[in-house]
Amino acid sequence: MLFRSYREEYDACGCFEYYASGNGIGARVRDAVRANKAYKGKLRQKPICRISAYDVFSAYNEKDPIAISVLHKAVEMWGMASANLVSLLNPQKIIWGGGVFGPAGIFIDDIYKEACKWAQPLSIKQVEFVPSQLSGNAGLIGAAFLAIKNHLYE
């Protein structure tokens, strides 16, 4: 996996998870709100321990500086991760789905631009980034499919 030549902060949950998952996005914002006593933005209106990724996307839409900073970092990490996939596997399409990618679907073009900085140049020109048609229900639908498949073919 591609990494920058320096390390930012470390968290035992792992770099990608810390920056780019729904739980990680919420945790980074909670840390930032706690650390910035002067911050008076939208995310301060709720108990810090209850701030979720959903709140971060809502604050982003209202141009909250902490939400913007955290989500821009997530876009960078999603771009780097997808660049690794493109460079290693040379897919035709990357489908973005899951809980975070309901609201994060607005970033797909930005993720592609970030991936272009890191990916193998010929491969990245041949891949398409698209949102899942299943949105945040991909995991649920996949689990239902497996249950039905296993029940029918036992």
Task: Give short role names for the model-derived ranges.
Residues S5-E154:
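ATP-binding/phosphotransfer module of carbohydrate and carboxylate kinases, centering on a glycine-rich
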